[in-house]
Amino acid sequence: LKTFDEDLIDIDKNLELLNNFFLQVKNLIVDNNVIKKDYSNKKILFEGAQGALLDLDHGSYPFVTSSNTISSNISIGSGLQVDYETIGIFKAYATRVGNGPFPSELFDKIGDYIADKGVEFGTVTKRKRRCGWLDLVSLKYSCEINNVKELCITKVDVLNELDEIKICKSYQGKQFQDINFSDSAYLNNCKLNGSDFELFPSWGNIDGIMSYDGLPQNLKN
């Protein structure tokens, strides 16, 4: 630290700080072997964070996080062999925080509207998220690498007041199997040279609707 003209760290002060943190989470920490023994016939909730395309190995490298975010990391991270069915959760539009390829990104007032209406700001940094149209290509890829069997769509109401909705259905007409999702340069090129979109009419207000049957036909489409 002296080499970089930085102040020396107060070791005792930092140890005391870390110990205070430890005391707060102490009762939440357990050895995995205890879980195997005591919870073998019970349901366990595993919590992860960040989207599939930020996965260290399968995301749009190098614009990824420092760990695996796909569902199979449950077994890797916990050491437990888990038999599970994956439900994929996605928004009715696409978002991204920070740099990285985003073929369906919006740079106009619609993108700003989605960010404001959907409260798309970083949880910690409060940084505004980049917003774009729903990208079926990346969604399909995310389903494949997570072995998704069912899908749950969220934030549909954010798009209620728009006149038209676009959905990205392909990248420059390429077949899905020909796309390399780890090649950020290629994905950026798709954004610069145009992705392929399909236009849909909006569905209007869906406030108070409590069943699938009650949803507007445009939304079902």
What are these regions (language model features)?
Residues 1-221:
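Non-transmembrane, aqueous-exposed alpha-helical and coiled segments at domain scale
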